[in-house]
Amino acid sequence: MIPFSVLDLSPIVEGGDARRGLDETLALAQAADRLGYERFWLAEHHNMPGIASAATAIVIGHVAAGTERIRVGSGGVMLPNHAPLVVAEQFGTLETLFPGRIDLGLGRAPGTDGATARALRRYFEGADQFPRDVVELIQWFEPASENQPVRAVPGAGLRVPIWLLGSSPFSAQLAGQLGLPYAFASHFAPELLLEALALYRREFVPSDRLAKPHAMAAINVFAADTDAEGVRLSTSMQQSFVRLSTGKPGKLPPPVDDITTILTPQQIAGAKGRLLYSAIGGPETVKRQLTDFIALTGIDELMVTGMMFDNTARIRSLEIVAEVREQF
């Protein structure tokens, strides 16, 4: 059985606010902790009315403080938005507070629109600088030399696991060349999944951080007690994707019984294309879909995610997936 992990974006639902979203994230993480999931990751997004995890490192600390065993990390920190030294200090602090429980996943996308990226002081050469920034960040975690003028405190000498995240061959090749674990964002960017995984494994060079390739991929999961309820729960995320694609992001809408009453066939097809890798339905249906995804990819670890309006339904979905996991 491979490890199962969870990705959460701290969704803000219609009628709710950021405080509710963060409270529900903690409740979800506590359920994942209780159910034996390996990791609970949070994503950096900015200027998104429906996502409360913009200050990712702070939310990680909140979740780690409210859980006992599960690893907590970033899925991910968008490194070009930050100075590598600051990231090392933040995650060095988290590792000091919660030793052996912190992961640092790194991405190179802005996690927002162009205007917000500029407000973050992100300049567009930042993505081109990403490989250098990753190497610099790794170096900040190395033990400091006696005469080193600048060091990460806390951070220097701490072994915080660093992952590269991505949705393209670029990140896959870089992760392989640096000998780092790799996580692919197949939950919203399915097109290049298999190509990227193959490239990562082919390019992998053993490092002092990782002896052999370790690949994780994400899949949307809407697990419920019946197939019909799973399909209904998935309609919130379909609506959200359509709104985002038309430049109108908002809070997460409630599910509907019949998605065809509010979206056009073209909109539904577009959303389903982005959500190609999804497991939707009752326990047996979800088990079959997860089995197929793991067999297709040969991944070493599975990450599940899913934007649902009702947090009780999200927790129930994790419970069903945990039950399914034990049957592998």
Model regions and ranges:
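Active-site mouth loops of central-metabolism enzymes
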Residues: D8-D23, V77-L85, A156-G166, R274-P283
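Acidic (Asp/Glu)-rich catalytic clusters
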Residues: D33, I60-E68, E95-I102, G176-Q177, ...
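A conserved active-site cap/scaffold subdomain adjacent to cofactor or substrate pockets
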Residues: A172, G176-E191, A196-L197
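Conserved, mostly hydrophobic/aromatic
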Residues: F4, A32, G36, E44, ...
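Hydrophobic faces of well-ordered beta-strands that scaffold small-molecule active sites
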Residues: F4-D8, F40-L42, V72-S74, I102-L106, ...
